[in-house]
Structures are given as structure tokens and as C-alpha cells.
Design a protein with these regions (language model features):
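Alpha-helical segments in soluble extracytoplasmic regions
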Residues: 14-72, 90
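Long, amphipathic, charge-rich alpha-helical segments that form helical bundles/coiled-coils
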Residues: 52-113, 117
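C-terminal amphipathic alpha-helix
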Residues: 19-25, 32-36, 90-133
């Protein structure tokens, strides 16, 4: 299921402190992505790897998304699982696109790729959060 308006959500699980904590973390992840995009817009040569590694820690992010996912019924989870895979893949690709040699400026094409990944991540987080609303 990919339509949040049709999502089946267990409200008791969603209201639990563990899932509410995960929900807040997912919102913070989306905010981090938005800040990275703004930083890259302001400075096309900005190295965002420290933020990716620290703020979007792969294992922690995956666990947080899966914790929030427990509030959704099985059919809904099929759609949200797909979004989780997209988010994790895009973070991996963003980290790869960010890599560059010292002293070599980032090319316009690489900048475009990174901005595209950040925009896609922002949308994916928004789409995922829509299931919890």
C-alpha cells in the first residue's frame, strides 16, 4: 500500500512511548536532510559526510524506521518497507556521491546528483511520515 490515506495504523502502538520516540527521530532525520540541502545550496563544495555519518547513522536510522513501522498493519507495511529501502539506498548513494579527492572541487554534475538525492530523501521521509499522521 502506497497511499497514506488508506494506511491501517494501530493507534495504541503508535501512541506508545517507543514508537513516538521513533516518530520524533524520523522527523529529525528529515530536518537534517533539509539542513544538508540548504548547506549545499549555500556552499556547493560543502563536505556533508560528517553529517551523513553522525546524523544519518545507517544502523540507527534503520532501527528507528523499523520501530515506527511496527505501528502499521501488514498491508501498510508493504508500502512503508519499500520507502525504508529507498531511504537507506539513497543515503548510501548520497555518501558515495559526496566523496571527492582533496583539493578537487565538486563538479556541477556531482552537485546536481547530490542535490537530487537530498530532494529525493526529503520526499521519501515526508512520504513515510504521512503514514503516521
Amino acid at each position: 500500500m502506497l497511499d497514506p490515506s488508506q494506511a491501517e495504523v494501530d493507534q495504541d502502538i503508535l501512541k506508545s512511548s517507543v514508537v513516538q520516540g521513533a516518530l520524533e527521530k524520523v522527523k529529525a532525520y528529515q530536518s537534517t536532510v533539509q539542513k544538508m540541502k540548504a548547506g549545499l545550496d549555500a556552499d556547493p563544495q560543502l563536505n556533508i559526510k560528517p553529517a551523513i555519518v553522525k546524523e544519518l547513522d545507517f544502523a540507527s536510522l534503520r532501527d528507528t524506521l523499523k520501530t515506527l513501522n511496527t505501528a502499521f498493519e501488514e498491508d501498510t507495511q508493504r508500502g512503508t518497507d519499500r520507502l525504508i529501502r529507498v531511504i537507506l539506498q539513497d543515503i548510501t548513494e548520497l555518501e558515495t556521491a559526496n566523496a571527492q579527492k582533496d583539493g578537487v572541487p565538486r563538479s556541477p554534475r556531482r552537485l546536481e546528483i547530490m542535490q537530487g538525492k537530498l530532494a529525493k530523501l526529503d520526499k521519501a521521509f515526508g512520504d513515510y511520515l504521512a503514514f503516521a499522521n
